[in-house]
A protein has these predicted regions:
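N-terminal, positively charged nucleic-acid-binding surface of large information/translation enzymes
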Residues: 1-172
Length: 172
C-alpha cells in the first residue's frame, strides 16, 4: 500500500486553519484587523439603548511593564465585559491608570538614579509625569496585544488635571 492510499483511509476534518500558528507573523495582522473593524465601538453599537453594565477598572500603577498579575486582571475584566455584551448589555469599558504616590516616585528615583532632593518640586513632578506616561503607553500596548477590548482612546489617568475634581463631583 502506498502512502497516498493510506492517507485516503483517514477521515480528518477539513479546515482553513494553518497547520502552524505563526503567531509572531500573524499577530500584527490580527491586531490591525481588530483595530480596523473598530471592535469596541461595534460591540457598543450592537447593544446601544439596552440595559447598561459598567465594570469600574481598579487601575494599575504606571510604574513598570505589565506582568502576569496585570495580564490575569485585564483578561478577567475583558471576559466579564464581553460576556455581558453577549447577553445584550451596553458595556462601556474605560481603562485607567493610577499615577499618584510612592510607587511612581520610588520607581523613577531607582531607575533614573534621580537625586530628587536636589530638584525643584515642579521638575520632579514633571519627571514623574513623563515616567508615568511612558509606562501607560507600554502597558496599553501590552493590553491591546492581549486583545482586551476597551475605550483605549479615552482612558482615565489620575495624573490628569481635573480628574480628582471630576470624581468628587460624581460622588455628590
Amino acid at each position: 500500500m502506498s502512502k497516498n492510499d493510506f492517507n485516503a483511509t483517514i477521515n480528518l476534518p477539513k479546515t482553513d486553519f494553518p497547520m502552524r500558528a505563526g503567531l509572531a507573523k500573524r499577530e500584527p495582522d490580527m491586531l490591525r484587523r481588530w483595530n480596523d473593524m473598530d471592535l469596541y465601538n461595534e460591540m457598543l453599537k450592537k447593544n446601544d439603548g439596552k440595559p447598561r453594565f459598567s465594570l469600574h477598572d481598579g487601575p494599575p500603577f504606571s510604574n513598570g511593564n505589565i506582568h502576569m498579575g496585570h495580564a490575569l486582571n485585564k483578561a478577567l475584566k475583558d471576559f466579564i465585559v464581553r460576556s455581558y455584551a453577549m447577553r445584550g448589555y451596553y458595556t462601556p469599558y474605560i481603562p485607567g491608570w493610577d499615577n499618584h504616590g510612592m510607587p511612581i516616585e520610588s520607581a523613577i528615583i531607582k531607575e533614573q538614579k534621580l537625586n530628587h532632593k536636589a530638584m525643584s518640586i515642579a521638575d520632579f513632578r514633571s519627571a514623574c509625569h513623563d515616567y508615568a506616561q511612558k509606562y501607560i503607553d507600554r502597558q496599553m500596548d501590552g493590553f491591546k496585544r492581549m486583545g482586551v477590548v476597551a475605550d483605549w482612546e479615552h482612558p482615565y489617568k489620575t495624573m490628569n488635571k481635573g480628574f480628582e475634581a471630576d470624581r468628587s463631583e460624581e460622588r455628590r
